[in-house]
Amino acid sequence: MMPFIEIDHVDRIFPLPDGGRYIALKNIELKISQGEFISLIGHSGCGKSTLLNMISGLDKPTFGGVIMEGKEITEPGPERMVVFQNYSLLPWLTVRQNIALAVNRVLRDLPKPEQEKIIDDNIALVGLQRAAHKRPGELSGGMKQRVAIARALSTRPKVLLLDEPFGALDALTRGNLQERLMEIVQESGVTCIMVTHDVDEALLLSDRVVMLTTGPEAHIGQILEVPIPRPRHRLEVVNHPSYYALRGEMVYFLNQQKRAKKVGAVSQFAEAMGGNGLEKINLDLGFIPLTDCAPLVVAKEKGFFQKHGLEQVNLVKEPSWQAIADGIRERRLDGAQMVAGMPLALTLGMGGKTPLPMVTAMVMSRNGNAITLSKKFAEAGVKTLEDLRLKLAETPDQVSTLGMVHPASMQNLLLRYWLASGSIDPDQDINLMRLPPPQMVSNLEAGNIDGFCVGEPWNSYAVKQNLGYVIATDLDIWNGHPEKVLGMREEWVNKYPATHLALVKALLEACEYCDDRRHRQEILDYLALPQYVGTSTEYISPGFLTEYDQGNDAEAEMLLDFNQFYVKQSNYPSRSEGLWILTQLARWGYIDFPKNWVEIIERVRRPDLFGEACRHLGWPDLEGDHHNVSLFDGMVFTPNDPLGYIKRFTIHRDIQVTEILIDQIDQVNQ
């Protein structure tokens, strides 16, 4: 069903006198139903009024668009009426004449008696019959605002836009007008969008509260559903069981934004450096020998690092993901290709470690994994997840062991998700063993494990050695999931902003190169070199270039999305996807779920830096969706209720919620 109003990936950028630009709003996406009351809240300067102006047609988006009833809004119109904080009444006209001005202009085709009736009805609607012949100078502030509301409603609009309508009024008048507005909206069924700083006002009036982050590049940080039934009365709202929890969540969000550390100066500094004027040109970047290390290899071998001024990039081949994490902690590595959850895990101090604030400005690859089982399961007829559950249930005293590469890896999280969706508890019904990717096949052959979830080429290696078969690829579980990301210490990014920007640009171009299939054979030859993956192209090729053989009865087939580096906005560091990872780490007890999850996700996942790199390359500023995530079992993840999502699972560990004060962590590390 088409939404009544859709704000479709809107950016608003203002030019600056020095030739620069200020990105006020970034990637605003919101769908509004007819008759809904939406409040926009956030700190001053977050773009609330700018967004309202674009809905009204008084301003236009730089990118994206605002759609109402299937038509793009390009100019003001009488179906969208605005009520401003400053009333905007003509001082020489009476109450009646101010309202008549709107009616006579918009509804001029109606007979005069009908126009007069509309004017009278709206004066009565706001209770100003006795003041109808007074001028604005004779009215109180509250009465003036009632005139403004009556004038807006008199044109029979479909949408009422309120820009802090009660901000200048005393508390008693404000309260009375809020009650009256609720009654008017209830009677008229008009759709309302209101800008406010007052959290109590937002809760009283709204169906949903849209909370904007602090600018620049403000975006929707959280959307709060207000499940308080209508019609509402102030006392009943305050006494509702959810009122103080909702109010606390809004206040907490605003406090998070107040203390959030903003790094908007990065782009200006980077531009000022010019040319190859980077702060640091010699970098040590860690990687693991897997097929999807291709972007790093291509950036090195094809000269993308040098093109962007990074003259001395050393790719450090590490034995395990733990070694990558240790290298970052010890500052032996400047950065690394990381499993998708590692920047969050390091930031939160997963595993009892000292928290280390991290940044990821791009996803380097998507997909590329599979779940491989020992051939003994194939011989027992295990072809599906349900077959596996039944087989494991036959021998409850013999617990099978599966290998995974790192707790914060998508291999671990997707393997756990897959098992749990089949009623197999990954902590009770099976044993998960942490192993480096290159050691999976040898441990399978030795009988130390009964299967594993890992990236290529190790699944194909097991298949070709007739040691195992693939029961599922990650395309079967979550096609398009983030797999590897660029991980950097936050303090490093702040210290070397121009260098970080150059690194992201080089890797973006390398990712684009990787997803041109005409280059895949060349890249395959690079990957096979000893300093990189160091194994035969026979094992690296499946899924990357040639058909993927799962080692079962099925024919080998081309899986064009199996290794995804650039297409379909692959590189965008989606905050929704980062939040999904956070829920899974908490679901399995690896971390306490951070109470200030909005702040954590905003600090770690950095689409602003990604967008800056795209703009420097002359590319469109790609934007991901503030979207729901749905895996193969149909369970929908909604970013606005992460805790509720975890609790909907039948199998999960006890969930603890803790506040992580990231700025204090940063000071300790420095």
From Swiss-Prot:
Give positions of region: Linker: 255-278
What SMART domains does this protein's entry cite?
Answer: AAA
| Annotated Pfam families | ABC_tran, NMT1_2
Keyword line: ATP-binding, Cell inner membrane, Cell membrane, Ion transport, Membrane, Nitrate assimilation, Nucleotide-binding, Translocase, Transport
Where in the cell does this protein reside?
Answer: Cell inner membrane
Q: How does it assemble?
A: The complex is composed of two ATP-binding proteins (NrtC and NrtD), two transmembrane proteins (NrtB) and a solute-binding protein (NrtA).
What family does the Swiss-Prot or TrEMBL record give for this protein?
Belongs to the ABC transporter superfamily. Nitrate/nitrite/cyanate uptake transporter (NitT) (TC 3.A.1.16) family.
Under what name is this protein listed? Nitrate import ATP-binding protein NrtC
